Amino acid sequence: MLFRSIGVNGGSLDKRLLEKYGHPTAEALVESAFEHLELLEKQGFYDTCVSMKSSTVPTMVAAARLFREKCDYPIHIGVTETGPVKQGLIKSAMGIGALLLDGIGDTIRVSLTDDPVQEVYAAKDILKAAGLRKEGVNIISCPTCGRTRIDLIGLVNQVDAALKDCQKPITVAVMGCIVNGPGEAREADIGIAGGDGWGMIFEKGEQVEKLPYEQLLPALLSRIEKL
């Protein structure tokens, strides 16, 4: 089915609505959306997807929730003009994630001042975090602490890069110590727990192999290929 799209943006609201509401509020975005919907409906068009975007997370979320209370047209969700990558990822995860957990949102867009490919990766990660996407690896890792005896940050980054395009619906744990690591990650399909110059590979919380540190990553990736 081909959908027509209505895109309302807080930066380009009609002056009449800005005068009425004072600034681009959620109510102003929703009113603008319904005005455009009415124009399409008068022409017999009802297959429409609506987007109401703002660079302010609470406004975007409130607009989508208010719109959903009033009708059931499909909604495209996303925070616009999010800024640098770090800020943009946080804003997008907050806004899109909040709505997805409410059951709101039919299509999404992560807007970043970066390579558009990174927007796609971020969108997939948000869907996975919300429990709506099963494909792809879910990596869990612990914060570093006094028990960490390996380059945990470097190892996590290596695992992430190596599995970026893996579509297996598995959870991989990268833990900094063998004290709490296996227990904290027992729900993972497979993982690493580091020791002092060595580490172990575990599956479902059970140790399956003990190796020198430099062999951990290759061994982990080899086992993942066989899953």
Regions found by a protein language model. Name each.
Residues 1-2:
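Short, small-residue-biased leader/transition segments that mark boundaries at the very start
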Residues 6, 50, 99, 142, ...:
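Conserved, mostly hydrophobic/aromatic
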Residues 8-10, 195-196:
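Short, small-residue-rich loop/turn micro-motifs
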Residues 9-12, 17-167:
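Catalytic alpha/beta core domains of metabolic enzymes, predominantly
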Residues 79-81, 112, 143-146, 174-178, ...:
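Active-site proximal loops enriched in glycine and acidic residues that flank catalytic Cys/His/Asp
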Residues 155-182, 186:
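Hydrophobic alpha-helical bundle architecture
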